[in-house]
């Protein structure tokens, strides 16, 4: 299982998870949902307490990935499998992306706290 923090305008909005079977889930943090001034990260992922599930990477996140020759270069330079969409996402959107959303890999200490 791999997890990443999803930030909206540099504030942590929720957690994106890739499960061992390759499926994905996304959940907003409770405090994000409770705060009326915070908006959804996407129209396709409306702000709610429920967890979203998908067999594939959610289209919102998939559309943040590089394509074509850019994808080839990024994968080669970072030694990422071309089919590893989660790895590609956290590599290419950790510092900068088009729009207000960035995605950052959670380190082992954060995973222990989150699962503890």
Regions found by a protein language model. Name each.
Residues 1-116:
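Phosphate/dinucleotide-binding and metal-coordinating scaffold of catalytic cores
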């Amino acid at each position: 299982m791999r997890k990443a923090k999803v930030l909206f305008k540099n504030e942590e909005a929720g957690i994106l998870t890739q499960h061992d079977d390759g499926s994905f889930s996304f959940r907003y943090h409770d405090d994000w949902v409770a705060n009326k001034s915070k908006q959804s990260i996407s129209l396709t992922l409306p702000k709610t307490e429920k967890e979203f599930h998908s067999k594939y990477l959610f289209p919102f996140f998939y559309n943040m990935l590089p394509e074509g020759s850019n994808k080839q270069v990024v994968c080669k330079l970072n030694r990422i499998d071309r089919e590893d969409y989660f790895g590609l996402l956290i590599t290419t959107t950790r510092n900068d992306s088009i729009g207000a959303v960035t995605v950052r890999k959670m380190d082992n200490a954060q995973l222990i706290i989150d699962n503890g």
